[in-house]
Amino acid sequence: MSFIVYPALDIRDGRVVRLRQGDYAQETSYGDDALPRAQALAAQGAQWMHLVDLDAARAGGYTLAPLLASIRAQTPLQVQTGGGVRGRDDVARILDAGAGRVVVGSLAVRRPDEVVGWLEEFGAERITIALDARQDAQGQWQLPVHGWTENAGVTLDVLAQRYARAGMRHLLCTDIARDGMLAGPNISLYQHLSALLPGVAVQASGGIRDVADVAEARRAGCGGAILGKALLEQRMDLAEALAC
């Protein structure tokens, strides 16, 4: 399985931002230069990027189609993108706008019967299932919903295996406790998922601080890694990460 590095840009109100543990009240802004940043990522050798619509994630209705179209027209980047997917037509629209893959998150937890059908309709290579997880006191990985305020009632392992049986090829898993914290990725979680889901490209997300973390995610069996805050704050060289 190939390993893909996904430099990430999260967009809110037209600005590149990062949230701390998904909290909209804990935002750091990095400017309104998303397209030049994407062009710079391509110039450094990136083949894919991860683009998140934070406004749509909150209110629905994907708003980044113009930016996505510009990135596709002005760079060779493939784009994995999501935020605000509320139904099948949203997936179709985002793919039509030029996405290489559409990320389906909260809906993948709330309406799995529907999302399983999209893997067949659009093709498993065009859908990334995103599951945000938090470990409970018993060591089980729960899937918080509604702004990470309550658990979905199904564990990460159970739902991930269900999607794997349905043909899922790409799983983005974020350890909520590490999101935006630059504390290192949860390697034991990704080792577990990679062993549990043979043939699925597991994307490590949350806490990656440097090239060593990227290399460790690859050794853990991951098929990719999302690079956010560490790149934006120039704590990591993208070219070195791509060479892992």
Swiss-Prot record:
State the reactions this protein catalyses: 1-(5-phospho-beta-D-ribosyl)-5-[(5-phospho-beta-D-ribosylamino)methylideneamino]imidazole-4-carboxamide = 5-[(5-phospho-1-deoxy-D-ribulos-1-ylimino)methylamino]-1-(5-phospho-beta-D-ribosyl)imidazole-4-carboxamide
Q: What is its main location?
A: cytoplasm
The family line of this record is: Belongs to the HisA/HisF family.
A single GO cellular-component term on record:
cytoplasm
Listed GO MF terms? 1-(5-phosphoribosyl)-5-[(5-phosphoribosylamino)methylideneamino]imidazole-4-carboxamide isomerase activity
What does the record give as the active site? 10 (proton acceptor), 132 (proton donor)
Keyword Translocase attached: no
EC number of this enzyme:
5.3.1.16
| Any GO BP | L-tryptophan biosynthetic process
Q: Where in the cell is it found?
A: Cytoplasm
What keywords sit in the KW lines? Answer: Amino-acid biosynthesis, Cytoplasm, Histidine biosynthesis, Isomerase
Organism, by scientific name, is Stenotrophomonas maltophilia (strain K279a)
Q: In which pathway does it act?
A: Amino-acid biosynthesis; L-histidine biosynthesis; L-histidine from 5-phospho-alpha-D-ribose 1-diphosphate: step 4/9
Q: What is this protein called?
A: 1-(5-phosphoribosyl)-5-[(5-phosphoribosylamino)methylideneamino] imidazole-4-carboxamide isomerase
The cysteines joined by S-S bonds are: none
The cross-references to InterPro entries, in alphabetical order and at most eight, read: Aldolase_TIM, His_biosynth, HisA_bact_arch, Isoase_HisA-like, Isoase_HisA-like_bact, RibuloseP-bd_barrel
Q: Does Transport show up as a keyword for this record?
A: no
